[in-house]
């Protein structure tokens, strides 16, 4: 039987977006459409509900990774490991992590510090008289660095080499806030799948709705068939204005509110 995993990432302290995604997932779980839920990190930063987001994810018992922002705040650092393109962006980023470090509770900081950098799942596939296993690797940025950006235009061969080195058939990651899925044939005959989940709380693809991915593994197919893994990117409407207005009412830069509205 196929199994479906829901994987979310990059919530970034946006509680209304997370609540909308969890409501969507609860309905799917009730209908038996989802078997498990995972989170790839970056719970905090840029918006106003870092403690509430961390508490909700933790309270749900969702297996969660540390994103680069979580690591920075977990260590009470002034560096989130982010790549800001301009001096103005860097200055706003410094304001964000400074405010977040002042806002989080000791309990939230301990939780962020406890999160692992990767999660590996072995999914067994009954096939003919033998059994194959799909190796699923979940990271925030890449297998090499928590803050490495893997964009869709990266050469396919680079993805394949990275996944071969990590022993992964399917790699799930976030960090760029831009969803995509690549099916990657390789020289050993198997097809590898690289899946960026997109972002729950701070999309950058022009669509302000919250995003996550449903990953379905088909037990009737082998790893030489691209169809053994299917990724469906889901978008969920939420009250973007409420999140943006909360940013504007806080000491955080107003630019972050515009980014929520414009998904950039």
Role assignments for model-derived ranges:
Residues 1-60:
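N-terminal active-site segment of His-dependent metallophosphoesterases
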Residues 12-16, 45-48, 69-75, 120, ...:
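Active-site environment of divalent metal-dependent phosphoester hydrolases
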Residues 20-23, 52-55, 78-81, 152-153, ...:
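Short, glycine/charged-enriched secondary-structure capping and boundary segments
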Residues 32-33, 103-183, 264:
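His/acidic metal-ligating clusters that form di-metal
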Residues 53-54, 59-121, 133, 153-167:
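Active-site neighborhood of divalent metal-dependent phosphoester bond hydrolases
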Residues 183-264:
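Acidic, His/Gly-rich catalytic cores of divalent-metal-dependent hydrolytic chemistry
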């Amino acid at each position: 039987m196929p199994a479906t995993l829901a994987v979310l990432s990059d919530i970034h302290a946006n509680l209304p977006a997370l609540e909308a995604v969890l409501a969507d997932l609860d309905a799917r779980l009730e209908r038996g459409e989802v078997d498990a839920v995972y989170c790839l990190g970056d719970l905090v930063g840029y918006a106003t509900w870092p403690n509430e987001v961390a508490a909700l994810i933790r309270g749900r018992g969702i297996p969660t990774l540390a994103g680069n922002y979580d690591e920075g705040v977990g260590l009470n650092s002034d560096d989130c490991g982010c790549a800001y393109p301009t001096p103005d962006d860097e200055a706003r980023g410094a304001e964000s992590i400074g405010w977040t470090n002042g806002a989080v509770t000791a309990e939230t900081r301990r939780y962020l510090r406890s999160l692992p950098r990767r999660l590996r799942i072995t999914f067994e596939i009954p096939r003919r008289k033998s059994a194959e296993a799909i190796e699923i690797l979940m990271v925030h940025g890449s297998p090499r660095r928590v803050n490495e950006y893997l964009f869709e235009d990266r050469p396919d061969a680079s993805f394949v080499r990275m996944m071969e080195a990590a022993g992964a058939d399917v790699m799930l990651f976030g960090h760029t806030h831009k969803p995509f899925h690549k099916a990657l044939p390789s020289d050993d005959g198997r097809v590898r799948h690289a899946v960026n989940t997109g972002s729950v709380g701070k999309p950058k693809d022009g669509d302000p709705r919250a995003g996550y991915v449903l990953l379905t593994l088909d037990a009737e197919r082998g790893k030489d068939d691209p169809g053994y893994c299917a990724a469906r990117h889901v978008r969920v409407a939420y009250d973007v204005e409420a999140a943006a207005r909360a940013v504007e009412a806080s000491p955080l830069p107003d630019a972050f509110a515009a980014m929520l509205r414009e998904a950039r």
